[in-house]
């Protein structure tokens, strides 16, 4: 009556040489997603995933650790060159970029894709402290 041990399907190694690193640096966290040219995710990581909680998630060091983690996972799939797209005003922008270089990727281009409104929505009322 004992059940057979379940076979765990091993994740197949994608053999991709070039990818795009999307660095989303908000005021509270930094998220790094490495995709192929079509936008299919290869690896991802964030400061919160790496064990940083609260205000420590928004530090440059947390962004560096998250970028190293995402980079190592992507390198296992054969990624060697990266285009980097940086979005957001956070403090982890530059440190995440340096960490991706330190992992050993050849960075071909760096683009800032931060969305800038053409005077979007009305701001909330002024704070009175």
UniProtKB/Swiss-Prot annotation:
The species this protein was found in: Zymomonas mobilis subsp. mobilis (strain ATCC 31821 / ZM4 / CP4)
GO cellular component: ribonucleoprotein complex; ribosome
Similarity section: Belongs to the universal ribosomal protein uS11 family.
Keywords: Ribonucleoprotein, Ribosomal protein, RNA-binding, rRNA-binding
InterPro entries xrefs: Ribosomal_uS11, Ribosomal_uS11_bac-type, Ribosomal_uS11_CS, Ribosomal_uS11_sf
Quaternary assembly: Part of the 30S ribosomal subunit. Interacts with proteins S7 and S18. Binds to IF-3.
Domain of life where this protein originates: Bacteria
Record bears the keyword Transit peptide: no
GO molecular function: rRNA binding; structural constituent of ribosome
Protein name stated in the entry: Small ribosomal subunit protein uS11
Any Gene Ontology biological process: translation
Function per UniProt: Located on the platform of the 30S subunit, it bridges several disparate RNA helices of the 16S rRNA. Forms part of the Shine-Dalgarno cleft in the 70S ribosome.
